[in-house]
């Protein structure tokens, strides 16, 4: 019987903690539910103490108690009274006049101490309910429905809208099963209406967010039409929201008004929100007068920022200047309900200071900051919107807005409005007025001073006045050391002066102050590119690309870095991303064509060059490449079209007209080629190359004009020799350049024309022709071929003997023409 009683041993004194975790299982309350004896005691009156009917005699303390079994000696306690729980032979019994609960006469016969009557065995348990009973099934089904609704809401909050809808549908199906089962077991009055309402409302909400508006409206109709649901009429506002999304403005307004009628007047906030929705619907429907009525009512009952802002927009839409002013004044008088004084510690009490510091950045303070930022945004936007129209000029309008703001609780916004006024002047190309306003602001307090100086620095930088830009950048930095825009402007001025290392330091400082300053990150990438630190530049642009995913400038810079790193495949890949962002940029398309040309993919290069030409047909380099491409493929007529366009774009460049004539000659149209050469000679009478081509072509065609052109060529060459001698006498070393120039001209006359021999672009040859500065002198590089020795072989129209004759060096053997007139 005593196996459940654990007594601490008296002799074991070595281990102080022995038996520390031992306890009497009687006191294990967690197992009481499974304790049959305890459950019997709870269900019955077994073991309860009877009411006390006598008092303990005072003599019981001093004399032993005699029983029917003989006199026993009592054990005195430390306070002089007998211990009530111990007798001889280890059998315990009460030592009071009243028998305690759990003590019987059986204890005197050697029974163990059993206060809970565990020796009697477990009592018969109460009849348990069957798990498959209808009530248990209903409870279990209710639990499952609630869990499905919760899971649907959680999935919606996590952004998994499809899963949320599926869970809501499952909850609806199980709820209908639950209703049918409950109707079979109990009366209809016992149906859980709250559960039905929550299931239907959640299902309608999930339909709405999944843009299944018809199903959502049907579900809301089921709720609204059921008179058993209290306050279901407010859901008509949700139905109005759905109609608003569907742009069914008349029905949206109808349901908003029905919801408004069912909201009691004491619920003022809800009524205000519904009226705001009505106003927004009227604005989207273009009914500004009706919207004005709604917002005017709101501003008279409970003015708020959104209503005041929308009211200003409505008056702007109908063009009422005076009402615009009044609406703006109402907007700036809306109370913010922000107490700034509570964030200032009034005493030196450390506890108070600690509390003040704790609430300076708590959630409530963050909400107040967001509310203030929203108010400033609405006021600034409204001022910029109405300032150009409320007065005769936008300057007067801004002045009126500034005066009104200065007299309100938003005094600090007045300076921001002045800066916006300067920006407006810049948009109107009035540079001087903008600078004057910013210079006035630059003399005010530090915050405005820094902003004004930053803008002035940017203006002077764009005007190439780097000294003034640097000066104002210094002022801005000194006024606010943590202004990233000021540090970026200072870095720009240093960058313009070529000190790239110092510029990088300013950009780094700007990034340390504001890690989201994309301008500084972009500029530091350009700086590293200038310093030829390409890996670091690439890291900067890749970081910027992670922030600005669709920035064409950043993508182009990454492609440019890969090109500098001699990785054309990666450069092409990034340029393709640029084209996906801005598919009509001719510069990017021409760059792609250039890279494909370097890789030897002429077909892809032609595709992108042609696309670039379509979007911008005035790019000389693109026209030049396309002309060379058609020459390579021997489509002379196509090449003529591009060179003629180039001659229109650069009429002072003789090389384009010479190229046109050369293409005519190669296509076999000698008469057209001769006319083109003659026309070129009339425009550029001192061009040596044109005269040489005329002499050769007229001689081959047997024309009498050959003698005249030969005399002009001889006279022109003599004049050129005299000019070169004068240059040589005044400057040393010019003779070598003259020899190089003459040798180049003579060598070109005898060489075959090939625009792409050995992979060379035509531009390398065309640049050898005279430019705009020296239109009549021969070039120092290869010139356009003037001979008839053609790499394509003999022309079909010409006999073979003529082709052989052209190869002969004595083509111009004529007694009237001197050898000095022939091209070397």
Curated annotation (Swiss-Prot):
Ranges of compositional bias, category Polar residues: 748-757
MF GO annotations: kinesin binding
Keyword Iron-sulfur: no
Biased composition (Acidic residues): 809-824
Coiled-coil boundaries: none
UniProt TPR repeat ranges: 197-230, 233-266, 272-305, 307-338, 415-448, 450-483, 484-517, 518-551, 552-585, 586-619, 620-653, 654-687
Keyword annotations from UniProtKB, A to Z: Cell projection, Cilium, Cilium biogenesis/degradation, Cytoplasm, Cytoskeleton, Flagellum, Repeat, TPR repeat
GO BP annotations listed: cilium assembly; intraciliary anterograde transport; positive regulation of cilium assembly; regulation of autophagosome assembly; regulation of cilium assembly; response to silicon dioxide
One CC-aspect GO term: centrosome
InterPro entries in the record: Sel1-like, TPR-like_helical_dom_sf, TPR_rpt
Biased segments, Basic and acidic residues type: 797-808
Start and end residues of each stretch annotated as Disordered: 113-134, 724-824
Tissue expression profile of the protein: Expressed in the heart, brain, liver, lung, kidney, skeletal muscle and pancreas.
Subcellular location(s) of the protein: Cytoplasm, Cytoskeleton, Microtubule organizing center, Centrosome, Centriole; Cell projection, Cilium; Cytoplasm, Cytoskeleton, Cilium basal body; Cytoplasm, Cytoskeleton, Microtubule organizing center, Centrosome
Superkingdom to which the source organism belongs: Eukaryota
Functional summary from the UniProt entry: Positively regulates primary cilium biogenesis. Also involved in autophagy since it is required for trafficking of ATG16L and the expansion of the autophagic compartment.
Subunit architecture: Component of the IFT complex B, at least composed of IFT20, IFT22, IFT25, IFT27, IFT46, IFT52, TRAF3IP1/IFT54, IFT57, IFT74, IFT80, IFT81, and IFT88. Interacts with IFT20, IFT22, IFT25, IFT27, IFT52, TRAF3IP1, IFT74, IFT80 and IFT81. Interacts with IFT172. Interacts with IFT57. Interacts with IFT46. Interacts with IFT70B. Interacts with C2CD3. Interacts with ENTR1 (via N-terminus). Interacts with LRRC56. Interacts with DZIP1. Interacts with CCDC38. Interacts with CCDC146. Interacts with CFAP53.
Record protein name field: Intraflagellar transport protein 88 homolog
Organism: Homo sapiens
């Amino acid at each position: 019987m005593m196996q459940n009683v654990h007594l601490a041993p008296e002799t074991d004194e070595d281990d102080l903690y022995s038996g520390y975790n031992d306890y009497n299982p009687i006191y294990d309350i967690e197992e009481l539910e499974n304790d049959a004896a305890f459950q019997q005691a709870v269900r019955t009156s077994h073991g309860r103490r009877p009411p006390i009917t006598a008092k303990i005699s005072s003599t019981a303390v001093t004399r032993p108690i005699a029983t029917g079994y003989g006199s026993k000696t009592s054990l005195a306690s430390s306070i002089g009274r007998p211990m009530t729980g111990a007798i001889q032979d280890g059998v315990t019994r009460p030592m009071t006049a009243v028998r305690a609960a759990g003590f019987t006469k059986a204890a005197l016969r050697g029974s163990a101490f059993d206060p809970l009557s565990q020796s009697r065995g477990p009592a018969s348990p109460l009849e348990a309910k069957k798990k498959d009973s209808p009530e248990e099934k209903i409870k279990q089904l209710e639990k499952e429905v609630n869990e499905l609704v919760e899971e649907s809401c959680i999935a919606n909050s996590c952004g998994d809208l499809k899963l949320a809808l599926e869970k809501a549908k499952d909850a609806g199906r199980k709820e209908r099963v639950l209703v049918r089962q409950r109707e079979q077991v109990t009366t209809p009055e016992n149906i859980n209406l709250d559960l039905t309402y929550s299931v239907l409302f959640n299902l309608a909400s999930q339909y709405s967010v999944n843009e299944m508006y018809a199903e959502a409206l049907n579900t809301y109709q089921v709720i609204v039409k059921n008179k058993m649901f209290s306050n279901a009429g407010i859901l008509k506002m949700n139905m109005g929201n759905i109609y608003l999304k569907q742009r069914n403005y008349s029905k949206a307004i109808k349901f908003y008004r029905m919801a408004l009628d069912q909201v009691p007047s004491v619920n003022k906030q809800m009524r205000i929100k519904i009226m705001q929705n009505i106003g927004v619907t009227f604005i989207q429907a273009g009914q500004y007068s009706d919207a004005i009525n709604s917002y005017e009512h709101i501003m008279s009952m409970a003015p708020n920022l959104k209503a005041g802002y929308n009211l200003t927009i409505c008056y702007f839409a109908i063009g009422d200047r005076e009402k615009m002013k009044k609406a703006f004044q109402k907007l700036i008088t809306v109370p913010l309900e922000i107490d700034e004084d509570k964030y200032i510690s009034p005493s030196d009490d450390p506890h108070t200071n600690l509390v003040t510091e704790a609430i300076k950045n708590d959630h409530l303070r963050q909400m107040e900051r967001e509310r203030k930022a929203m108010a400033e945004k609405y006021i600034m936007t409204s001022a910029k919107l109405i300032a150009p129209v409320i007065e005769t000029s936008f300057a007067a309008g801004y002045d009126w807005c500034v005066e009104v703001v200065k007299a309100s609780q938003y005094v600090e916004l007045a300076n921001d409005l002045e800066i916006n006024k300067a920006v407006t002047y810049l948009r109107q190309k009035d540079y001087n007025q903008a600078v004057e306003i910013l210079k006035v602001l630059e003399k005010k307090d530090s915050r405005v001073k820094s902003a004004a100086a930053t803008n002035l620095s940017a203006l002077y930088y764009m005007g190439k006045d780097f000294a003034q830009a640097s000066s104002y950048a210094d002022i801005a930095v000194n006024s606010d050391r943590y202004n990233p825009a000021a540090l970026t402007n200072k870095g720009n001025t240093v960058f313009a002066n070529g000190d790239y290392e110092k510029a990088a330091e300013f950009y780094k400082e700007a990034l340390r102050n504001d890690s989201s300053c994309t301008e500084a990150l972009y500029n530091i990438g350009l700086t590293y590119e200038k310093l030829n630190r390409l890996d670091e530049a690439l890291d900067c642009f890749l970081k910027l690309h992670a922030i600005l995913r669709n920035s064409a400038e950043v993508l182009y810079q990454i492609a440019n870095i890969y090109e500098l790193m001699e990785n054309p495949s990666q450069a092409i890949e990034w340029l393709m991303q640029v084209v996906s962002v801005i598919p009509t940029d001719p510069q990017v398309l021409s760059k792609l064509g250039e890279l494909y040309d370097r890789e030897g993919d002429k077909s892809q290069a032609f595709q992108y060059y042609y696309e670039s030409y379509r979007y911008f047909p005035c790019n000389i380099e693109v026209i030049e490449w396309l002309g060379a491409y058609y020459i390579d493929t021997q489509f002379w007529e196509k090449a003529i079209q591009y060179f003629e366009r180039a001659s229109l774009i650069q009429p002072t460049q003789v090389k384009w007209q010479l190229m046109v004539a050369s293409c005519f000659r190669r296509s076999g149209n000698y008469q057209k080629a001769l006319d083109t050469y003659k026309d070129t000679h009339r425009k550029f009478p001192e061009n040596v190359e044109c005269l040489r081509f005329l002499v050769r072509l007229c001689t081959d065609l047997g024309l009498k004009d050959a003698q005249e052109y030969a005399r002009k060529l001889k006279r022109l060459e003599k004049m050129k020799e005299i000019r070169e001698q004068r240059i040589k006498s005044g400057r040393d070393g010019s003779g070598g350049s003259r020899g190089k120039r003459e040798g180049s001209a003579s060598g070109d006359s005898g060489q075959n024309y090939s625009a792409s021999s050995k992979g060379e672009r035509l531009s390398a040859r065309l640049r050898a022709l005279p430019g705009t500065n020296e239109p009549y002198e021969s070039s120092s590089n290869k010139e356009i071929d003037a001979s008839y020795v053609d790499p394509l072989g003999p022309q079909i129209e010409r006999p073979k003997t003529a082709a052989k004759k052209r190869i002969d060096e004595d083509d111009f053997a004529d007694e009237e023409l001197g050898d000095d007139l022939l091209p070397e």
